[in-house]
A protein has these predicted regions:
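Short, solvent-exposed coil/turn segments at beta-strand boundaries
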Residues: 1, 26-30, 52-54, 73-74
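Short aromatic-glycine-(Arg/Gly/Cys) micro-motifs in beta-strand/loop hairpins
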Residues: 1-19
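N-terminal targeting/docking segments
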Residues: 6-9, 22, 49, 66
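A short, exposed loop/beta-hairpin motif centered on an aromatic-Gly-Thr core
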Residues: 15-29
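Short, non-transmembrane alpha-helical segments in secretory-pathway proteins
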Residues: 31-36
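Short, mixed-charge low-complexity intrinsically disordered segments
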Residues: 38-74
Length: 74
């Protein structure tokens, strides 16, 4: 298991929200995939996954609402 800092950004296009909502947490995970699958089981297959050059893992779901999860190993 690895420890991650997780930043979740939520944008609601329908409600006309002008500002994103961000949450921060630290968690010990066996896999960031499992974390996303647990939170969004119905939509997991529609998330895109990107591994950035600095090792950060970013999952994005963008439809009426947008979720962006950033996992940084600590």
């Amino acid at each position: 298991m690895k420890e991650y800092e997780i930043v979740c950004t939520y944008l609601n296009g329908c409600a006309g929200a002008a500002h994103p909502i961000r949450t921060f947490e630290e968690a010990e995970l066996s896999s960031p995939d499992d974390y996303i699958r647990e939170k969004h089981s119905a939509d997991f297959s529609r998330f895109t996954k990107e591994i950035q050059s600095d090792g950060k893992i970013v999952y994005t779901f963008s439809e009426t609402v947008t979720y962006i999860y950033e996992f940084t190993e600590i």
